[in-house]
Amino acid sequence: MCIRDSFTDMGMEITNEAIQVFGGYGYTKDQGIEQLFRDNRITPIYEGTNSVQAIDFVFRKISQKKVFENFMKYVDTEIQNCSKVDNLNEHVKKISELKNILSDFTDWISPNGNTPKDDISASCNDYLRFFGYFCLSFIWLKTMRKSYENLENNKEFYEDKLNTGNYYFDKILPRAESHYKSAISGSKYTMSAKFN
């Protein structure tokens, strides 16, 4: 679920950027970018919107600790495999740090814990986004390990994979921590909003 939501959010971001790249011309029907944007716009709404999915993820899925624990064991195994590849040491260190943050974040947001329910509810979107960025970093780490293992078989193809993975770690993944910081700030101002 968190991967699907991450892709739908990123799809919106990417098609929006594509319109911007084309300038006013991207807004016309000539290039098809506006159609891609319109087609993409529905994806965050499918299955009850990403925000509803975030609430469901936290209150139903994450509260079942076993699923989270099994996923973390799987991540640990891949981290061990990747730590044997010298070129991935920096990324292994980063994903290990984020794994610790994700564990703390999960304990904090767990409906079974001590965090007030309003704080949890106000933080579901941030948790889902953090989890999505983390999962994508895990997938990129695994992809990069496989790319290094097969580099000589198809150098150009795997170098592109490695470059894209490095880009993700350097330019996209740092967004994750902002969602953690936003979430743990609580819900005081979110819940004090008055709608007249």
Listing of model-derived features with the role each one plays in the protein:
Residues 12-15, 30, 39, 51-55, ...:
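Alpha-helix initiation and N-capping motif
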Residues 9-28, 36-59, 128-138:
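Conserved phosphate/anionic-ligand binding catalytic regions in large, soluble enzymes, centered on
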Residues 1-3:
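Short, small-residue-biased leader/transition segments that mark boundaries at the very start
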